[in-house]
Amino acid sequence: MAGTVASPEGITNPPIDDLLTAADSKYALVIYAAKRARQINAYYSQLGEGLLEYVGPLVETHVQEKALSVAMREINEGLLTSEPIEQQ
């Protein structure tokens, strides 16, 4: 098809440089986003059971969008906060 170019989503949108403002390092960003993605997946899993233990997506989602992409967009929009865990 002439004139149509797929715009990449997921890890390329939002850009990594924008996401790194919310975390101390790339590793911390990965852990942060992965934990939130697991919460989003758990939210969708619990809907069928009638439980409301987890918080659902805070941004508008698309049907085929992965939980990690949703988590990255939430982080980029500043809807989540991260606190460092104190080592004992």
From Swiss-Prot:
The keyword Nucleotidyltransferase applies. The keyword Transferase applies. InterPro entries: DNA-dir_RNA_pol_omega, Pol_omega/Rpo6/RPB6, RPB6/omega-like_sf. The RNAP catalytic core consists of 2 alpha, 1 beta, 1 beta' and 1 omega subunit. When a sigma factor is associated with the core the holoenzyme is formed, which can initiate transcription. One of its GO terms (cellular component) is DNA-directed RNA polymerase complex. It is an enzyme of class 2 (transferase). This is DNA-directed RNA polymerase subunit omega. GO terms for molecular function: DNA binding; DNA-directed RNA polymerase activity. It catalyses: RNA(n) + a ribonucleoside 5'-triphosphate = RNA(n+1) + diphosphate. Keywords: DNA-directed RNA polymerase, Nucleotidyltransferase, Transcription, Transferase. Its EC number is 2.7.7.6. It comes from Kineococcus radiotolerans (strain ATCC BAA-149 / DSM 14245 / SRS30216). GO terms for biological process: DNA-templated transcription. Promotes RNA polymerase assembly. Latches the N- and C-terminal regions of the beta' subunit thereby facilitating its interaction with the beta and alpha subunits.
